[in-house]
Swiss-Prot record:
Record key words, sorted: ATP-binding, Chaperone, Cytoplasm, Nucleotide-binding, Stress response
An individual GO BP term: proteolysis involved in protein catabolic process
Keyword flag Transcription: no
Family under the similarity heading: Belongs to the ClpX chaperone family. HslU subfamily.
Subunit and partners: A double ring-shaped homohexamer of HslV is capped on each side by a ring-shaped HslU homohexamer. The assembly of the HslU/HslV complex is dependent on binding of ATP.
A Pfam cross-reference name: AAA_2
Residues given in the record as ATP binding sites: 18, 60-65, 256, 321, 393
Name recorded for this polypeptide: ATP-dependent protease ATPase subunit HslU
Function description: ATPase subunit of a proteasome-like degradation complex; this subunit has chaperone activity. The binding of ATP and its subsequent hydrolysis by HslU are essential for unfolding of protein substrates subsequently hydrolyzed by HslV. HslU recognizes the N-terminal part of its protein substrates and unfolds these before they are guided to HslV for hydrolysis.
GO MF assignments: ATP binding; ATP hydrolysis activity; peptidase activity; proteasome-activating activity
């Protein structure tokens, strides 16, 4: 679980997302409150529930990107889902309970990785001994039983030194490692994922505990044996319990496109993929118990962050009960031409940096002048105004159009230095930006 302060979280998000200070503050406070709650004593800790967030803003302004970056910072079980993928219980399609099942699977991977890292030192020692046993087989007594290994013999120490220095890396040995689980792909109708999971687990259990002889280089054998030994040091039942605790106490669910499940107009009848989904989401957000293959998971303290453009629907079109479960509302503002300029240059791995790095692989040095960046930003902003406003995603389209010729010829331009200035941008984009019909089809 992340122990970063709200200011540190916002500072980290600032490196990747331009503007949207209110949204960054809201998620930073929510993430910090997870840590604060865990510092409380038990009777009070249980009463403190997370304040779920609803992010409202046009497409392409950073809602999903905030979630993506938050997942990396949180160091907690995290899952992002599209609200449109689900249907009401009893109809064909995914049930909302599968969100918690997927979140628990994600927690299992996270906790397993943490446990492996904790035991890595011991696993490395044991893997080293197994490689040395293969290189220098221990003596057997008259009954064929292996005598106690002498780890301090001179020869063994010489081989240990060579092994640690990498002198034996390319030597081939034959080792016994755990056989991979049988991968059985079962195609089942939507909504029956739980049954397929149980069948897959059953087939995997049939093959667990079996070993397989493999011939490989010592350097690869060490990696395989370290993973093998680390897996043996992990208690599966303890792992499941830790994963369930991580989900219940620190889990975060990001529900995108929630505006697409709002009821439209005075439509009457079974609305299984809209209002029905909202009704099914209610118990999850409010707090219920979901049965997963790892055990029962309570959702009382899972943080839910929902987002939507709300261009056709409004937040008030959500059913009142769900509105009440999303008390924190954050509006993200539409991006200006100035924001586009900053997006092109300021974030880590900005778009201009990406294109420079891609062309550098061909030996072409690309330089974007300030006037070029300004013209690109203006072009993207104008096309957004004239046609559909898709936010920062328009920059990808404009940049691809701008770099089209250089990208095609780059393999024959090795060693050249290309300066992209305002005139170059006008020449490459001018006609398309000015002609509204062309903008519709090309940008």
């Amino acid at each position: 679980m992340s122990e970063m302060t709200p200011r540190e979280i916002v500072s980290e998000l600032d490196q990747h997302i331009i503007g949207q200070a209110d949204a960054k503050r809201a998620v930073a406070i929510a993430l910090r409150n997870r840590w604060r709650r865990m510092q409380l004593q038990e009777p009070l800790r249980h009463e403190v529930t997370p304040k779920n967030i609803l992010m409202i803003g046009p497409t392409g302004v950073g809602k999903t990107e905030i979630a993506r970056r938050l997942a990396k910072l949180a160091n907690a079980p995290f899952i992002k889902v599209e609200a449109t993928k689900f249907t009401e219980v009893g109809y064909v399609g995914k049930e909302v309970d599968s969100i918690i099942r997927d979140l628990t699977d994600s927690a299992m991977k996270l906790v397993r990785q943490t446990e492996i890292e904790k035991n890595r030192f011991r696993a490395e020692e044991m893997a080293e001994e197994r490689v040395l046993d293969t290189l220098l087989p221990p003596a057997k007594d008259q009954w064929g039983q292996i005598e106690e290994r002498d780890t301090n013999t001179n020869t063994r120490q010489i081989f240990r030194k060579k092994l640690r220095e990498g002198q034996l890396d390319d030597r081939e040995i034959e080792i016994d490692i755990a056989a991979p689980n049988i991968g059985v792909e079962i195609m089942a109708p939507p909504g029956m994922e739980e049954m397929t999971n149980q069948l897959q687990s059953m087939f995997q259990n049939l093959s667990s505990g079996q070993t397989k002889k493999r011939k490989m280089k010592i350097k690869d054998a060490l990696k395989a044996l370290i993973d093998d030994e680390a897996a043996k040091l992990i208690n599966p039942e303890e792992l499941k319990q830790k994963a369930i605790d991580a989900v219940e106490q620190n889990g975060i669910v990001f529900i995108d496109e929630i505006d697409k499940i709002c009821k439209k107009g005075e439509y009457s009848g079974a609305d299984v993929s809209r209002e029905g989904v909202q009704r099914d989401l209610l118990p999850l957000v409010e707090g219920s118990t979901v049965n997963t293959k790892h055990g029962m998971v309570k959702t009382d303290h899972i943080l839910f962050i929902a987002s939507g453009a709300f261009q056709v629907a409004r937040p008030s079109d959500l059913i009142p009960e769900l509105q009440g479960r999303l008390p924190i509302r954050v509006e993200l503002s539409a991006l200006t031409a100035k924001d586009f300029e900053r997006i092109l240059t300021e974030p880590n791995a900005s778009l201009t940096e990406q294109y420079q790095a891609l062309m550098a692989t061909e030996g072409v040095d690309i330089e974007f002048t300030e006037s070029a960046v300004k013209k690109i930003a203006e072009a993207a902003f104008r096309v957004n105004e004239k046609t559909e406003n898709i936010g920062a995603r328009r920059l990808h389209t404009v940049m691809e159009r701008l770099m089209d010729k250089i990208s095609f010829d780059a393999s024959e331009m090795s060693g050249q230095n290309v300066i992209i200035d305002g005139d170059y941008v006008t020449g490459a984009l001018g006609d398309v930006v000015e002609n509204e019909d062309l903008s519709h089809f090309i940008l």
